[in-house]
Amino acid sequence: MRRTVLLVTVLLVFIGGCLGQMENPRPTNNPSTSHPSDSYSTLPTTKYDVLKEGQEKPVVNAINSFTFDLYKELAGNNNNVFFSPFSIETALAMAYEGARGKTAEEMKRVLHLPEDDDARWTGFRYLLLSLKSPEGSPFILRSVNALWVQRGYSLREEYLGIVKEFYLGEAKEVDFQGNPAEAAREINEWVEEQTNGRIKDIVSGLSPLTRLVITNAVYFKANWSSRFRASDTRNETFHAPNGTVIVPMMHQTGEFPYFENDDLQALELPYEGERLGMLIILPKEGKFEKVEGNLSAGSIENILKNMREEKVKVALPKFRFEASYKLRDVLMDMGMKRAFLVPDFSGISNGENLAIEDVVHKSFISVAENGTEAAAATAVTLTMNAPMQEKEPKIFKADHPFIFFIYDRETGTILFMGRMMNPKDG
């Protein structure tokens, strides 16, 4: 039996007509407008596909820095946390491409986006192309973007081109004004299809004032490189903040990247294909708040650099839960106020004043045993040799709250971040 991780995340940015104030719009160099169906029907090959070492780094650094800023906002209680900073950053970056003036300045600062257009465009295009699992890959990973536009509403041709070329996003026309229920159904069907049915009915009650919905969906499914045997799973105690609970605990002993200091243990479990891995940060007794408070892109990078292959005896709970967040207030608290209150999205359209109505993020994770391993055997012949002093394996027992990341080992991009406080809380 294999242990499979299934991760799904969806982000929706609702942009509607704004009846309030708006910044004085900055003129754009290209005032032409277009309906989504009129332009960019095929994905062009551009100079941005010429690979350069490190070209994705500015965007990776932005995503990883944003990860910890957002985590601090979401982790204000003892609940489980799970979100995709990659998904959220990507969708908001698409909105940023149409922001102007102080609205753009605030968004750039909160999202840590590169100042240089080419660096931003190159980085996102590279990541979105690079992170798509190829045919025959041992894991499934896809990130897809779409713009849902009010039928007949004109978007700037320049904006449509940027989203199509650099964010690989497709534009679809719906009728928010005349039939918002049908528009919601179409978006929900798309989300359900892109997430293999894991996330349903994410949109409801759309306003007739809605002009644009920006969506990003990320889906990931993989097996561990080193499998847990179902026969080794047993019910054990997990020490949650509000008391102990009994959970199924997985066990195995193997060679894994490992790091330890006075405050924490860190373990990496690679997935099949070795491209992606789960990094688990397990604070030592009484150190959770200290470890959590010190988390940053730099501290995680330092842990990864100092990991060494060690023999580790691993105990990890099975868990499965959904998380749903409305991020409007969170993003405003982080400093992104103008996008909601006094916006300038004149780079998206020449028409009505546009404002972000809300940002909705929904995610799902399942870490469980499934599938079958049939008729496989390995024979190893051993001969007696002089006894050697064998090091005792490190003990990594995740029977109390821990923090985890799913990240791309090639670029260092954090795709998902979570906090497991109680595996029983689904």
From Swiss-Prot:
GO terms for cellular component: extracellular space. Gene3D superfamilies: Alpha-1-antitrypsin, domain 1 (2.30.39.10), Antithrombin, subunit I, domain 2 (3.30.497.10). Pfam families: Serpin (PF00079). The record marks N385, A386 as: Reactive bond. PROSITE patterns: PROKAR_LIPOPROTEIN (PS51257), SERPIN (PS00284). Belongs to the serpin family. This is Uncharacterized serpin-like protein TK1782. It comes from Thermococcus kodakarensis (strain ATCC BAA-918 / JCM 12380 / KOD1).
